[in-house]
């Protein structure tokens, strides 16, 4: 996800360890890195129309300074094609209406499932998108999604890897409805250690292991609905796990560029990036809440999500901002699709251990992640049966 303030002592310790174990570090580099032909410089977009050529090291330095961007080196066409559907024309329900139907489903959400998945997901040395570990973690995640569909008997549903030239694939699970109008639920699967991405550990428990397992659990329970399972929902639902978010929203850009070219009719996209950290909120004396992002998002979809949280979650929301290109919903927006983003807290209280070796499970609240899962499940179900024009 976006860069949080990284702690200098963590860098110093990492540098000392790297220097002391130089030979071991070289071995890790050789094991992790894939053979990938990379350009000398990358074209990044820091705000609409503001572009710059930078080296890879300069990309990471920008991230350390909390500066986000699209890497548009290979995705310059995203957002340039005319689409048949105007995102501004999408109208969302005036209020949630499936309270009674969702009540028993919400009870099926299990934080123990999220913990078990996250324990394995964070056991990979890193999920850096250009590493062999990143390839392995993506393959493991694909297997978990396949198992989720198989266990549910979801014969109409499917899942596929969306390959990328850097090695780590994105993943797309599709639950067909009665129309091609599509609701997308997303999270990113990669992690990064911004000090030495190629070889330092990046457990990525919160960023974005938490979002990854949150939407996986929402998918599992959504498939307990007979109507969803039988393809009787009005709209198609997709769950996306993006590769290479940390490199400049690369995986989501590739997917939404392909959707734009195919004139795919995406009615809504919700990103879940960092769903588990609450300690800074509590330390500040503030009530536990979820953070609804209000900048660079679709206002209509965001307003409906606020209603979803009010009805289906046990904690309130706060309104907050995260800036341009701060997570994968920005790729959907750039393609002309209405998107939204809900994070774990007010942005100023979000996890500052991300992108380091300290982004660990022990700092997360699975009760809080359960609230994100409730919101995700409820939104997916409500919009699956929404009547869009």
UniProtKB/Swiss-Prot annotation:
**What are the disulphide bonds in this sequence?**
322-326
* Naturally occurring in which organism (per UniProt): Pyrenophora teres f. teres (strain 0-1) (Barley net blotch fungus)
Cofactor stoichiometry and binding? Binds 2 Zn(2+) ions per subunit.
Lineage of origin: Eukaryota, Fungi, Dikarya, Ascomycota, Pezizomycotina
Q: Which residues form the propeptide?
A: 19-89
Name the encoding gene, please.
lap1
Cofactor(s) listed: Zn(2+)
Q: Where does Zn(2+) 2 bind?
A: 207, 246, 355
Q: What is this protein called?
A: Leucine aminopeptidase 1
What InterPro entries does this protein's entry cite?
M28_fam, Peptidase_M28
